[in-house]
């Protein structure tokens, strides 16, 4: 079997609760055991993965770590080098939206435009326009 370089995308991956973190950990470990090179590309909160699996962190604002407006505002204001996507993420959250999938998809698409040396990309529920662009290339 040909050994592949595989990217697994996960917009939010709490390592101990819920299904996403468990799924990403299990599939990345299984693919690594099969001999493939695996990178997990994730937004916060980040995974605890097997040592042989590379974790690439795509930091977002992680505004859902708190539900306090003051703390969310502080997170946003303390972010250095704000981009348009950060303003969108903050304002959408402010009005009750859940923009993490969309903003992660945008960041992942930008990352994979530069780092396009993967044989396969597996997305774990990001469901965003960025994923449509990634799908065209992989």
Q: Model-predicted segments: where are they?
A:
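Intrinsic-disorder/low-complexity, polar/charged segments
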Residues: 18, 80-83, 125, 136
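An aromatic- and histidine-rich active-site surface loop
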Residues: 94-109, 120-138
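A conserved catalytic-core segment of Leloir-type glycosyltransferases
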Residues: 42-107
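N-terminal subdomain of nucleotide-sugar transferases
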Residues: 1-61, 113-116
